[in-house]
Every structure is written in C-alpha cells, then in structure tokens.
Amino acid sequence: MSAAPVQDKDTLSNAERAKNVNGLLQVLMDINTLNGGSSDTADKIRIHAKNFEAALFAKSSSKKEYMDSMNEKVAVMRNTYNTRKNAVTAAAANNNIKPVEQHHINNLKNSGNSANNMNVNMNLNPQMFLNQQAQARQQVAQQLRNQQQQQQQQQQQQRRQLTPQQQQLVNQMKVAPIPKQLLQRIPNIPPNINTWQQVTALAQQKLLTPQDMEAAKEVYKIHQQLLFKARLQQQQAQAQAQANNNNNGLPQNGNINNNINIPQQQQMQPPNSSANNNPLQQQSSQNTVPNVLNQINQIFSPEEQRSLLQEAIETCKNFEKTQLGSTMTEPVKQSFIRKYINQKALRKIQALRDVKNNNNANNNGSNLQRAQNVPMNIIQQQQQQNTNNNDTIATSATPNAAAFSQQQNASSKLYQMQQQQQAQAQAQAQAQAQAQAQAQAQAAQAAQAQAQAQAQAQAQAQAQAQAQAQAQAQAQAQAQAHAQHQPSQQPQQAQQQPNPLHGLTPTAKDVEVIKQLSLDASKTNLRLTDVTNSLSNEEKEKIKMKLKQGQKLFVQVSNFAPQVYIITKNENFLKEVFQLRIFVKEILEKCAEGIFVVKLDTVDRLIIKYQKYWESMRIQILRRQAILRQQQQMANNNGNPGTTSTGNNNNIATQQNMQQSLQQMQHLQQLKMQQQQQQQQQQQQQQQQQQQQQQQHIYPSSTPGVANYSAMANAPGNNIPYMNHKNTSSMDFLNSMENTPKVPVSAAATPSLNKTINGKVNGRTKSNTIPVTSIPSTNKKLSISNAASQQPTPRSASNTAKSTPNTNPSPLKTQTKNGTPNPNNMKTVQSPMGAQPSYNSAIIENAFRKEELLLKDLEIRKLEISSRFKHRQEIFKDSPMDLFMSTLGDCLGIKDEEMLTSCTIPKAVVDHINGSGKRKPTKAAQRARDQDSIDISIKDNKLVMKSKFNKSNRSYSIALSNVAAIFKGIGGNFKDLSTLVHSSSPSTSSNMDVGNPRKRKASVLEISPQDSIASVLSPDSNIMSDSKKIKVDSPDDPFMTKSGATTSEKQEVTNEAPFLTSGTSSEQFNVWDWNNWTSAT
C-alpha cells in the first residue's frame, strides 16, 4: 500500500503560524489593556496564545480549516473588544471620567453607588479605590474566561445533544451499507470498504486525501437524507396501521365481552382458512385481537400501569437479545410494548369474566355449558393472538433446512397439542367450584406468562405448527360433538395431557449453576481470523444462506438448553451450548458487517452439531413426557377408574401418535442394547477361553482343584453368596448386568466382604477377575480375584467341597452347570419374595457408586504421588538428603509446610516454579502445569505441593508397619551400610533351595503378598499379571537368580550402597551417626 498522503496543513511555514499567533496576541493584549491588566497578565496571555494556536493546528485536518478557525476566533474577540471599548468611551464622555475609571464604576453599579459617590470615595480613601480597581480587573478577566468556556460548552453541547431518533440515525449510519452508486463518488476507496465506520477508520489512519474527505462528506449527507426519508415513510405506514387498529378498539366496557365471545362455529374452520393467510389478513379476520388500550385507566391502577410498562420494556429487551444481535427499530419496539400491555389487559378481563362465570355456574346450573365454552374461546384467541403478534414482529428468521424442518414441525405440533389439551381440561375444571376455579385461573395465567416469554423467541418456529394443531384439534372436537347424540347428559371429560416442560421449577442451585455457566461462557476469549479475502463470492453467499437458515435452530437450542439441564443436570452439555452461542453470535455479527471469520465447512459442522443437540434435547423432552403421562394414567386409574375410558376418547389420535413414536424409539434402543450385550458376551467368552488355555498351560496342577470348586459351586445344596460365584466356569452372568438380581447397596460395604478382600490370595490360582471398586487401588492394571472372598486355594479345594453346606437357599440355584447362564433361564430365577422382577443396569451400577468414587479418588491419589516425586527429583536433584527426607515425610503424613530442607533452593528455580520471574512460561509449560494434578509452589525455602482435587484433606501417609518393613531384618549391632546391601541381595535369600538352587518350592514363591493389603496396592503387584506371559524359573522370571555371583557382580552390588567409596571407608561409616550423613551430602 502506498504511503500516507501529506496533509496540506503541513505546508504552512513557521512564519505564517507566527503571524497568526501575533494577531491573536494583539487582540488579547488590547483586551488586557482595556481591563487594566498588569505585565504579569501580559506574560500569561502570550503563553496562552501560543498554546491555543498549537492546539488549533493539531485539531484541524486541513489548512483551510485551520485558517478559517483562527480568523473566526480573532474576529470574534476583536468584535468583543470593540463593543466594550465603545461602551466605555460613551460612558466616559457622558460623565467626564476616564474610560478605565468609568468601566470600573459600571462594574460596581450592583452595589448601589452612583458616580458622584464613587468620586467622593476616591477622594476620601485612595487605598479603598485601588482595591476596588484591582477587584474590578479580576472580575472582568473572570467574565472573559467564563464567556470563552460557555462558548466552547455550547458548541460541544450542540454537537452532543442529539435526540434519541437522531442518535439512532447516527448509529444506523455507522453500520448501514453504502449504496454502490454513492460509493463510486468517493475516489480511492478500497473494494472491501462499504460502511461509514470503515471509512472513518481509514480517515483516522490518514489514508484519505482532503479531496476524498470532501467527497465523503457530501456522500454522507446524501446517504443520511435517504435513510431519513426511508424511516419517515416507515413511521408513517406504521402510524397509519396503528390508527386502523385503534379504530377497531372497543368504545365501552360492555363491548369487551361481546368481542371476546367469538362463536365456536367460527373457530371450527378448515385448516387452510387460517394457515395460508398472512398476519395482516388474520388481524382483519374473525381472529382480530380486541384493543383495550383506550380503557387502560379503568383496568389497571397507576402503580400497576407503571410496573406493567417496566415489565413490557424488559420483555422487549430480552426479545431483542434472543435475536442474536439483530436490532429492533423504535416503532417496532413501541408496537411490541403496546401489544404486550394489551395482552395483559385482556388476561385480566378474562380472569374477571372467569370468576363471574363461575359464580353464575354455582347459582344456575343451566349456565354450565356457557361457562365451559367462554374460557376455551378466550384461550384459543390468545394463542392465535400470540401467533399473529410474533409473526408481525419477528420477521427476520427464515425456514430451516428441509431435513431438520420435518423434525421440528413434528415436535412443535406435539408440544402445541399438549398445551391446547391442557388448557381445555383446565377450563372445564374451572366450572366445578369457585375456589378451585380461582386457583386454576392463577396457575393458567402463570403458565401463559412463562409460555409467552418462551414463545417470543420461538414464535416463527411454532407458528405454522400451532395453526395446524389448532385446526386438527378443532376438527376432532367437531367430530366428537357430532358423534355424541346427547352432549348435555354425557359431558365431555378431556384428559389432561402432561406438558413435558410443566413442573420444571428450577431450584436455587440450578439458577446459580446456569448463571455461573453463562457468565463463564461470556468470558470466553474468541480468536477469530478474518478469511474474507480467501473466500469466493459463491462461498460467501452460501455461508450467508446457511447461517440465515440455521438462525431458528440456534435460537431454539439456546432457549431450551436451560430447561433440559433442569431435567438431566448435565453441566457439560449446557456449558457447550453457551459457548457455542457466543461463537455463533460473533459469527453472525461479523457476517452482518460483511466480514467472514469461518469457512463453509465450519458452518456445515456447526449446523450438524446444533441438529444433534436439538435431537438429543427432543429425546429428553419426549422421555419426560412419557413419564408424566404414565404418572397421570396411574393417578387417574387410582382416583377414578370408572371414567378412564371416557377420558381417553378425546385424545386417542394424539396418544396413538405419541405412543408409536415412543415405541419406535424404545425398539431402536432395545436393538442397540441387545447388539451391545451380544458383542460383550462374545468378547467375554473369547477372553475366558484364552485365559483358560493360558491357565492350563502355566498351572496344569491347579486344574483339579478348580474343577472340584466348579462342581462344588454347582451343587444344589451348596450355599455360596451371590458375590462369591466368580470361578473360572461361572463368570458370564456378572457381565450381563440386565439379567442379574438386584444387589443390595449394603452388600458392597459389609464387614465380611472387606475381611475376605483383605485375606490372602493364592497367586497360582488362575481365575477370571473384575475390578472390585471397594478396594483402594492406585494402579489401573490391578485386579483382585473375585473368588478371594470365599474361594479356597487349590490345595484346600477338596476339603472345602467336603464341608457341610449351609441350609439357606442360594439365589443362583437355577444356574447351568457350564456356568454360562441362558438369558431365558435367567428370567425364571425366583427371588425369596416370589417372582423376581427385572432390573436394569442403572440399578446395579448404583450399588457400586460408593466404590467407584473411592476407586476414582485413589487413582487420582496415585497420579498425585507420582507427580510429587517427579517434582522432588527435579528440584532436589543436587540434594539426595532432601529428596529422601521429603519422601519419607510423605509416608509419615507430615505436611509440606512443616518439612525443612537442608539446602537452599536457587532463586531461579523459585521464580520458575512460582511464576514470579521476568520470563513468562511458554504455552507448552503452561499447558503441562494446567494438566498437572497438583499445584506446586516454593514458600520460605519449602516445597509445597497441594492437590487440585482435595486441597485440605489429602494425605499420602502409609501405615508405620509398612515403613518398618523396609528395615526388616536390620537390628542389633548393625552399623555398616554394605551389610544392608548384601543382605537384601536376592542371591543370599533364605528362600533358595540349597540342593537345587535353580528350582524353588511353590510355597516360597510369594507371588501374592501375604502381609497386608497395602502391598497389593504397591507398584510391584503387577508381577502376577506379568508372570502369565513367562514360565516359572525362566531367565525372564524376576524371582529367579543365578546360583552364584561373580566377584565383579558382588562389587557392583556393593557399590550400590550410598556414600561408600571403598571397603575401608565402609567399615568407618556408622549409619547411626548423623554427622556422617550430613557430611556425605
């Protein structure tokens, strides 16, 4: 791009600017002389003149503007000086007094003294005269400054004081696209610039020449006039339409009831008569909403009117926000507020009429039918009114894609039919009793107010579906009316359909969570890149079209997401929706300005994601609807079983459609679950076969014991608890959670189970295992045998089989001998209470909820321990003593703040850890720190590491017996570290057989720990799983050691002793002498 053009004001020479300063200074000095100023004031005036000229030069954009402003300022001040000088001269000529004295006397006229009294005072007290003269000069100077400030303020106010309409026009001019015919009149404009906001940015960057600026000003005026004329015509058209609506209003209160009572025959019209008309035709048809704004003072009190107006303004603002950045014009806002207040007035009139009709129904039984029809007509009118109003106001949204439109129409149709049926049932219930009618009227009003707030953002998405649903319901009602020969004797009893969103009253916690998630989403920092230049015109048009089609989908997902959260309590889903809402809003705003920040494929993925969101939300709403319908049917069957069949006659078609859709969904879900179960069973069978083959290959001697145990488990009189049937041949029923009996929650935490889990487990016994979540585990690969609770070792299997069985019945008597149960047979399993009910997998999973949380916490604890040790190795790499002591402190449960270090941590390391250095961490380092499971810091030369998940109660201590086990065998007169190293060598182990050093007895293998459950949780507990892959006593066996160690090997082992350099020094090193340890560091 070329360099910025040189401003013509820069061509002014210093001599010309000095000439302007002298001209301004001459006028100021004349005024100072007229005011009787001193030399000090003259010096200040010179400084002010220079500063004023410099400020004016910097403010001016051209030489012409600079010279005009300077000449105008000098001319104004010269005129002021001449006027004052003439006035002083005229007064002095009349009174024969010097001009300066006459000016001072005029300034002192407010004190009530005349010219003669002034002369007397001057003769009597010269000092007082001098004081008055000085005061007069100060007053004149102050007046001059005040006048200048007032002139500047008036100019600023003239620029700033704009009416709301002018301000709105200015704002509209900033974002309104400039017509191409006008844009061509401005030379040197880049092709991507089409708004005045962008032109202003170019001018501020000094990329436009003065000729361009002059042309831009002329074009701006023309464009402003065009917009003003267009707005004026729009206002006139709206005012004329409003006048027509006012002419259709009610002149008297008595006519309100006549206009509200529309005959039922007019409402039961064919669907095409109302669905194909536009909003203006609907307003002029039989569904015209009565206007009662001229009687607002008779309906509401002044306080109610003020509160209602404020409520209407807030509702209008909320509606404007839901349009994702689209601005509403002032006439549309006023029309919205008027219609909102009109609806409120109609609702109040309706409530009063309902109470009156209920009173008449109680006094006269013949008015029952009329009392039932009137509220239905009013409700239907209000529903039609909401449709017309929303169609008139929100016309910016467009239809969505065809694939999503069918789904949305079906969902909206079901939702609207439920609302209408609920309103009909409430209207019929109101005619029974006055108290009950008032309560239901209030509930209906609250429900309608909530529905209105939602319908304002969803009006266009449901307008067509509402009209179709109303016509369909009216046609059904008309058919039922013809089918009933005696409607008075057999009154219609409509069954109230459950509203899927009814009763979703959010708790205080829900409201707080939703607010917090919305606030967090609003703080999201979006870094969008302008890709406008990389897109073709065809791609731009496609992006605009798809965003316009998906706008309705975006609004619906954003509006229904909080309500679905109340059902599912899924915070991640709501958070994603809020974040995407901010993302979509930014995209739409940029697109409205002609800037594209996403490509076409990104828009496609975004719409697909929103469609998936909506489909998921629709399924949740339908599920809740099915639950509410079942609850209602159960309540109707329990409360009035004789009227169930008659109540269902009104909603047969609706229920059939809903049941068919739900049955299809359930059938698909069952098929998916069955396929998953079959796949899981096949995988489990394959795993079992592989494990059995490995078991027979590795431990052939253990097969008889397992077979005996399997036969014992299948014996009819044997009593083995449900949780203990986990042998090799009867394992599958645990994996198919649907067909198993319900496990009580208390069974997972019984003392007997904990005791059996902590028991010894023979490592050679091979059995299929599943994770036992009640055991604290720190290793993902750790799995404890399911037969650990009651399963004996292979040596005692026969003895156990001979033991006397318990007489209590086993819950798995019907299990087949091969251990793989048939699903059909599992359904016939009898419980102690009779027939065994079917349980789903959710109930079984809830039984292990406590253990799952514990296992998760232990897994996090393991990660924290590993991370703590890694940080210690990094920081204490030059201090083994601190590394050892801090690790030992963790084992003893000592807090980090109480641990002292022997070395001083370098300041560079402290700044790096605490992030207090001048050098900021890189993105990779910050990402690693965020993903770390602990927060690390160094305070007062102490390494403090706190858990991110449990900062206060986290402890890494272990039992003292386990700490003592490390030093097992060390005692007596032990002083030499080499003794510890040699004694711990596997070559000198007492477990080795002297006769055959390469072979060992099975009893001394000690693959499974025997002492405590803590050793099971140690990192070495995966030896058992590793031993499955190798043979015992093979070269890869970790427990197998060569018979003799060479001298070099012994020397290498000896050198492993810390702080030992030679054999002589090892004899002198006393482990109990602290000085030796400190000197070694």
UniProtKB/Swiss-Prot annotation:
Modified residues (Phosphoserine): 335, 736, 752, 783, 785, 789, 831, 1003, 1008, 1018, 1034
Cited InterPro entries: Gal11_coact, KIX_dom_sf, MED15_KIX, Mediator_Med15_fun
Biased segments, Polar residues type: 749-836
Sequence repeat segments: 422-423, 424-425, 426-427, 428-429, 430-431, 432-433, 434-435, 436-437, 438-439, 440-441, 442-443, 444-445, 446-447, 448-449, 450-451, 452-453, 454-455, 456-457, 458-459, 460-461, 462-463, 464-465, 466-467, 468-469, 470-471, 472-473, 474-475, 476-477, 478-479, 480-481
A family per Pfam: Gal11_ABD1
Region described as Interaction with GCN4: 25-49
GO cellular component: core mediator complex; mediator complex; nucleus
Residues modified as N-acetylserine: 2
Any Gene Ontology biological process: positive regulation of invasive growth in response to glucose limitation
Organism superkingdom: Eukaryota
Positions of the UniProt region annotated as 30 X 2 AA approximate tandem repeats of Q-A: 422-481
Keywords: Acetylation, Activator, Nucleus, Phosphoprotein, Repeat, Transcription, Transcription regulation
Region described as Disordered: spans on this chain: 238-286, 476-505, 692-712, 744-836, 1026-1055
Function: Component of the Mediator complex, a coactivator involved in the regulated transcription of nearly all RNA polymerase II-dependent genes. Mediator functions as a bridge to convey information from gene-specific regulatory proteins to the basal RNA polymerase II transcription machinery. The Mediator complex, having a compact conformation in its free form, is recruited to promoters by direct interactions with regulatory proteins and serves for the assembly of a functional pre-initiation complex with RNA polymerase II and the general transcription factors.
Subunit relationships: Component of the Mediator complex, which is composed of at least 21 subunits that form three structurally distinct submodules. The Mediator head module contains MED6, MED8, MED11, SRB4/MED17, SRB5/MED18, ROX3/MED19, SRB2/MED20 and SRB6/MED22, the middle module contains MED1, MED4, NUT1/MED5, MED7, CSE2/MED9, NUT2/MED10, SRB7/MED21 and SOH1/MED31, and the tail module contains MED2, PGD1/MED3, RGR1/MED14, GAL11/MED15 and SIN4/MED16. The head and the middle modules interact directly with RNA polymerase II, whereas the elongated tail module interacts with gene-specific regulatory proteins.
Identification of the protein by name: Mediator of RNA polymerase II transcription subunit 15
Species of the source: Saccharomyces cerevisiae (strain ATCC 204508 / S288c)
The gene coding this protein: GAL11
